[in-house]
Amino acid sequence: MEPVQYSYEDFARLPTTVFWIMGYDMLGVPKTRSRRILYWIYRFLCLASHGVCVGVMVFRMVEAKTIDNVSLIMRYATLVTYIINSDTKFATVLQRSAIQSLNSKLAELYPKTTLDRIYHRVNDHYWTKSFVYLVIIYIGSSIMVVIGPIITSIIAYFTHNVFTYMHCYPYFLYDPEKDPVWIYISIYALEWLHSTQMVISNIGADIWLLYFQVQINLHFRGIIRSLADHKPSVKHDQEDRKFIAKIVDKQVHLVSLQNDLNGIFGKSLLLSLLTTAAVICTVAVYTLIQGPTLEGFTYVIFIGTSVMQVYLVCYYGQQVLDLSGEVAHAVYNHDFHDASIAYKRYLLIIIIRAQQPVELNAMGYLSISLDTFKQLMSVSYRVITMLMQMIQ
């Protein structure tokens, strides 16, 4: 029995669901009035909490009275870089009209019939379990960073009969001897909503980027497979020319879609990659300074998922680069000897267009590929080593 072939809506479910966690509805799904109001209130609370936390953090940095050791300096450096990274990605996904437009174009192009979906092997391009687990682990490790302090406080209460009132971020100062408990609860609520805004913006934007890139890659593979399977002949030249004309049009359309994708995500992609590398560096150094603690353990998991996050963006960027070039190879290997001159002219058009590689790029000039990932990790390692030497 053939497995059920995934629809376009099935692909969209993961990125849409992730953004729902912070109350942001990317595709404008119809909702009841009461549900719309609840979403709006929750969205407002996340943004307001984020604004308050960033404001307090900036105040503490300007005041500079409470940042009195290397560990705190690295903690603040981590927070600043992560906020820049997350806010950059959030600004990107605010281009909702452009994202919805690209989504509609790809939905129209998606294989409609079951046989067509089988031919394009859509199920092979669906979100793998390992990717879904990566997203869950990333969000889970981020949650642990936030709730870790209160867990530590609860453990201290049961082991030493003292609740230590620890919380996540160092820029909120709480004195249990002077301040009422409701302030502690308010601080934790602010930190939770602030973290939700940052974490979901960070991972969610990349999932939308990968979602669109996977769809474009799927269609490039479809072109390559179609060329490999088709055998033209002068005996059915009319049908052959219709076939190859569709391939030419689809190639042009895919280039246009990739340009749309770069137009949405490319402007912020360079800054996102640089700040992600900075986050990895500062978190790694902070974790090494702190030593083996619950916080350190959750940060190690966070670093691992952040590295994988960058790797996947570069991996799919490499894929579209390779696949767009493989279209020309598919034409070279195409059995066109019995085809008409007109058919061969179409093939020449495809080859000429394939000479200009289609790529995921940052700001129009930096191609995102596995080489980018290697360079980024190499620089990150050198920065971590340099920072540790400076501290020691």
From Swiss-Prot:
Extracellular topological intervals: 58-69, 152-179, 290-295, 385-392
Subcellular location field: Cell membrane
Highest taxon of source: Eukaryota
Cytoplasmic side: 1-36, 91-130, 201-268, 317-363
GO annotation, cellular component aspect: dendrite membrane; plasma membrane
Tissues in which the protein is found: Expressed in olfactory sensory neurons in the antenna.
Keywords, alphabetical: Cell membrane, Glycoprotein, Membrane, Olfaction, Receptor, Sensory transduction, Transducer, Transmembrane, Transmembrane helix
Family annotation (InterPro entries): 7tm6_olfct_rcpt
GO MF term list: ionotropic olfactory receptor activity; odorant binding; olfactory receptor activity
Record membrane topology: Multi-pass membrane protein
Signal peptide limits: none
Ranges annotated as spanning the membrane: 37-57, 70-90, 131-151, 180-200, 269-289, 296-316, 364-384
Residues of this chain annotated as glycosylated in UniProt: N69
UniProt record, GO biological process: detection of chemical stimulus involved in sensory perception of smell; signal transduction
PANTHER family: ODORANT RECEPTOR, ODORANT RECEPTOR 13A-RELATED
Function: Odorant receptor which mediates acceptance or avoidance behavior, depending on its substrates. The odorant receptor repertoire encodes a large collection of odor stimuli that vary widely in identity, intensity, and duration. May form a complex with Orco to form odorant-sensing units, providing sensitive and prolonged odorant signaling and calcium permeability.
Family according to the record: Belongs to the insect chemoreceptor superfamily. Heteromeric odorant receptor channel (TC 1.A.69) family. Or49a subfamily.
Oligomeric form and interacting partners: Interacts with Orco. Complexes exist early in the endomembrane system in olfactory sensory neurons (OSNs), coupling these complexes to the conserved ciliary trafficking pathway.
Extra information: The atypical heteromeric and topological design of the odorant receptors appears to be an insect-specific solution for odor recognition, making the OR/Orco complex an attractive target for the development of highly selective insect repellents to disrupt olfactory-mediated host-seeking behaviors of insect disease vectors. Odor-evoked OR currents are independent of known G-protein-coupled second messenger pathways.
Protein name: Odorant receptor 85f
